[in-house]
A protein has these predicted regions:
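Metal-dependent amide/peptide-bond hydrolase catalytic core
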Residues: 43-171
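Fold-level recognition of mixed alpha/beta catalytic cores in primary-metabolism enzymes, strongest
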Residues: 1-75
Length: 171
């Protein structure tokens, strides 16, 4: 019983009050950091016109349109890599994480859905960063019909300065 009492007191002392330090497992290459990137993630659906693959001219292949969108996103990701490149968190990033489209090899697909991951350095606004991506795709793929879902994640980057990140997270 005495051993249980000692353990109980130890646990209570560790869990009471605010911690002196918190460890968050981020991919930092074992470097100590005091901030981390935020993220905004959403799905975009590129629309086409379905038809039988023996008459592809009667449809609009959403996979071809989505391929152009993916290449535009790759181009923007390269531009983002140059922005804030000396930031302790590294540069902002943009990635297509998943792509789904088509229902059969003999059908021209009418839709393709891409899941977008835009990582933010502290100080970047999640929704403004999302808007930048949407606008870039619209400018570079003007003929594509694209529907953007609301973000399923929008989290500002965190910094040891805290105030800017907290304001961005509330908006």
């Amino acid at each position: 019983h005495e051993r249980d009492s000692v353990a109980k007191k130890l646990i209570q002392s560790v869990l009471s009050g605010r911690p002196d330090m918190v460890v968050v497992a981020e991919p930092t290459g074992l470097q100590l950091v005091t901030q981390h990137k935020g993220a905004v993630r959403w799905r975009m659906t590129v629309c086409g016109q379905a038809c039988h693959s023996s008459y592809p001219e009667k449809g609009l292949n959403a996979i071809y349109s989505a391929s152009r969108v993916a290449l535009a996103l790759e181009s923007l990701s390269q531009k983002l890599a140059l922005r804030h490149s000396s930031h302790p968190c590294g540069a902002p990033t943009l990635s297509v994480g998943t792509i789904h489209g088509g229902v059969g090899v003999n059908l021209v697909p009418d839709r393709v859905t891409l899941e977008i991951d835009r990582r933010l350095v502290p100080g970047e606004d999640p929704l403004a960063s999302r808007r930048e991506v949407i606008d870039y795709v619209s400018e570079n793929c003007p003929t594509a019909v694209i529907h953007h879902e609301d973000p399923f994640l929008a989290s500002a980057g965190l910094s040891n300065k805290g105030v800017g990140a907290a304001k961005a997270a509330k908006s």
